Amino acid sequence: MAPAPDPAPAGSAAPDPASAPQGLPAASLLQLIWLASPALPVGGFSYSEGLEIAVECAGVTNESAAAAWLQEQLMLTQARGDLAVVHQALAAWRAGDAERVRALNDWVLHTRETSELRLQTEQMGRSLADWLRNQHAGDAEALSDVARLAALPPTYPVAFALAAARTQARAEDVLLACAFGWAENMVQAAIKAVPLGQSAGQRILARLAAAIPGAVAHAMQLGEAERQAFSPMLAVLSARHETQYSRLFRS
């Protein structure tokens, strides 16, 4: 006979699962997992966002350097820029504010300082719009939003915000999913470009995952005039990548 479980300590009550905070509805949680998945057909795997040229020119040649470089990019380009756009665009889509959506999309385009970085956000935005069109076939209201997105032309942060807008997810959860999806793609790029083993990649991903909540919190408190995309060395690296002799990635 199995031993009886130990009794709860005197003066304490066993936790009641029914009283625990309720999480996301299953459908919304699965949608966020789907959006963060590297299997989402938007082509994120084909971009390194400057990491490939950093391996050649900026000393990113081992696990420690790759982890530090990616963590800097998380804080410099994602937390201060793209994640803040996702946060603000999510609110705009849910409010039906088309002018605000357009302004945020234009801001993303203006912050891409090289042709390959601009092509990346445009290509991934178009691909996500195509995916949304297929997902919402037969839903006139959703397709109307997708048509507005496709007409911009869309950037990836604004398209991601629309993809999440029709879920019941909180803004924080949407940004966590977006950031983790970015981290997974970048770790896979590091594994190929440095190169690194799978275990090293998982250690880097663990470091990024630990930093993501702070990056999301920072992005969510930024106002309209506080977003920024000041990362001049990334622009220099990206420009050099355009003429790099041998490349695996498109950025």
From Swiss-Prot:
Region (Disordered): 1-20
Gene3D superfamilies named in the record: Urease accessory protein UreF (1.10.4190.10)
GO CC aspect terms: cytoplasm
Source taxon at top rank: Bacteria
GO molecular function: nickel cation binding
Keyword entries, A-Z: Chaperone, Cytoplasm, Nickel insertion
Compartments where found: Cytoplasm
Ranges annotated as biased composition (Low complexity): 9-20
Quaternary structure and interacting proteins, as annotated: UreD, UreF and UreG form a complex that acts as a GTP-hydrolysis-dependent molecular chaperone, activating the urease apoprotein by helping to assemble the nickel containing metallocenter of UreC. The UreE protein probably delivers the nickel.
Its biological purpose: Required for maturation of urease via the functional incorporation of the urease nickel metallocenter.
Family (UniProt): Belongs to the UreF family.
Annotated protein name in UniProt: Urease accessory protein UreF
Origin species: Paracidovorax citrulli (strain AAC00-1) (Acidovorax citrulli)
Upper taxonomic lineage: Bacteria, Pseudomonadati, Pseudomonadota, Betaproteobacteria, Burkholderiales
